[in-house]
Design a protein with these regions (language model features):
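Glycine-rich cofactor phosphate-binding loops and adjacent beta1-alpha1 units
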Residues: 1-40, 201-206, 211-215
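Rossmann-fold NAD(P)-binding glycine/threonine-rich loop
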Residues: 6, 20-38, 42, 48, ...
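Beta-strand-loop-alpha-helix segment that lines the small-molecule cofactor/substrate pocket
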Residues: 12, 217-263
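Predominantly a Rossmann-like dinucleotide-binding segment in NAD(P)-dependent oxidoreductases
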Residues: 37, 47-65, 81, 256-258, ...
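Glycine- and charged-residue-rich phosphate/anionic-cofactor binding loop of Rossmann-like
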Residues: 55-102, 167-168, 404-405, 423-440
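Contiguous beta-strand/loop segments that form the cofactor/metal-binding neighborhood of enzyme cores
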Residues: 106, 110-122, 284, 312, ...
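N-terminal Rossmann-like dinucleotide-binding module
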Residues: 126-186
Length: 444
């Protein structure tokens, strides 16, 4: 409060107080009222900071709208330094070899330094692979390279692979640090900041792509062209052009190269039980995803990066319905919520028509209550009904010898990765037929 008060005392009438950094904001009205002062909090580098459209997509603010943007601030400072009007050299207190970094960071308050420079060795070689050394592999098949070290990879994929006793040779991430941390946790042999090291290693049999959605297609194609089998988290791709390129890469890959998409729900014991009980023939399927609200600024809504939640998430249930139907989608239509729904809507009802006469309705809603089950599937067939409640309980009506099945929540991830690891080591048919993957992706 005192800092703001002093600033108001110093300011002229109708002046502006700009806060750079963090101080308490317990302000007094009188400090601003008498002089009609304005108060502004400055973003760290200037307007545009934390704005995805500005920072990563290059959409600048008009000059008349914002004079000093993040980019213009940097440009002005760099120009001032290059012209000599701003002297920063005199601020440099010391230069220290990287090996002696503790001289700077030991006790910064006592040091009295204004600015310090860390000097890297002139002959140092940039390495994109770091050996973790916890697991030296023996000869044999089944080695895996993972591209992507995000939350889902860490929380779900790595534990499932560990239970399957999978051999992870690489974990890659763009920055490298997250890959190294996760590699230590997973017992992987290497961490890398360049996924090309995975693609070019002849010992790697399976490449797992777990990055943001817009990178899936490119990395799948590169892996296939390098003769690697691929597992990619859903979705396979974001548009038909990418899908056509994937088809060509798959058809041109060496014999025995497989492509699997992370449609894990079909591998749940609940889904497999439903498929056995229902058998063949036409069915009516109603699948509801109470997906929950995600703020609009989150990347999954960005059509160029995430593809929207229908492409990015609802594809799970299109594959599940296809698995339960035992047939391929031949027609699709969709109605979205609202008078003028957005292209990246996350409130929609999807109607699927299958070749064997099955009808499926998928309700993907983001406007429901968190207290209601996230996922529910109902199937009607031959005077029988199956109801799956949130992957915890399956109830049957009209079935001889079956009434219900209960277990802990199981969406099929564990079985999916166990089977995948077995296939990579021992060979066998693809987990999901390529034609089924294509059909689901086209329908999505």
């Amino acid at each position: 409060h005192e800092v703001i008060h002093q600033a108001s005392e110093m300011s002229r009438k109708r002046g502006r107080i700009v806060l750079v950094g963090v101080v308490g904001l317990n302000m007094r009205r009188d400090d601003f009222y008498k002089k009609e002062l304005s108060f502004q909090v400055s973003c760290s580098y200037g307007a545009g900071r934390y704005d995805e459209e500005y920072e990563n997509k290059g959409h600048d603010y008009p000059l008349a709208y914002v004079r000093w943007t993040e980019k213009r601030n940097f440009e002005t400072i760099l120009h001032a330094i290059s012209s000599g009007s701003l002297d920063v050299k005199s601020l440099i207190t010391e230069e220290v070899d990287l090996a002696d970094y503790e001289e700077i960071y030991g006790d910064m308050r006592k040091k009295g330094s204004i600015a310090s420079i860390l000097r890297f060795p002139a002959d140092s070689k940039m390495e994109s692979v770091v050996s973790i050394g916890s697991n030296a592999f023996v000869s044999g098949n089944g080695k895996i390279g993972i591209i992507g070290a995000g939350n889902y990879t860490s929380a779900m994929i790595i534990p499932c692979l560990a239970k399957a006793h999978a051999r992870i040779k690489y974990i890659a991430s763009a920055q490298g640090l997250s890959a190294k941390i996760l590699a230590r946790k997973a017992g992987a042999e290497n961490a890398t900041s360049d996924y090309q090291n995975i693609l070019k290693d002849p010992e790697v049999d399976l490449v797992m792509v777990t990055t943001r959605h817009n990178l899936h297609a490119r990395m799948v194609i590169e892996a296939l062209r390098n003769g690697k089998s691929v597992f990619v988290e859903k979705p396979l791709c974001l548009n038909e052009t990418e899908l056509d390129d994937i088809i060509r890469a798959y058809q041109g890959a060496p014999e025995g190269t497989t492509l699997t998409v992370g449609f894990n729900r079909r591998f749940s014991p609940f889904a497999e039980k439903m498929r056995r009980l229902l058998g063949d023939g036409p069915k009516n399927i109603v699948a509801t995803m109470n997906a929950g609200f995600i703020p609009r600024e989150v990347w999954v809504h960005d059509l160029e990066i995430g593809g929207g939640r229908i492409i990015g998430e609802a594809c799970h249930f299109i594959d599940l319905c296809s698995f339960l139907a035992g047939s391929e989608v031949v027609a699709v239509c969709m109605n979205a919520l609202g008078e003028n729904p957005e292209e990246n809507t996350d409130n929609a009802s999807i109607l699927l028509r299958y070749a064997n006469g099955t009808n499926a309705v998928i309700n993907y809603f983001a406007n429901g209550s968190k207290s209601y089950a996230k996922e529910r599937v109902e199937v009607f067939s031959q005077e029988r009904v199956l109801v799956l409640d949130n992957w915890r309980k399956l109830t049957g009506y009209g079935f001889k010898g079956f009434s219900s099945m209960k277990a802990g929540m199981d969406k099929g991830q564990k079985r999916q990765f166990t089977l995948l690891n077995e296939r990579i080591r021992e060979g066998g048919e693809p987990l999901i037929p390529f034609e089924s993957i294509l059909n689901t992706t086209k329908a999505t």
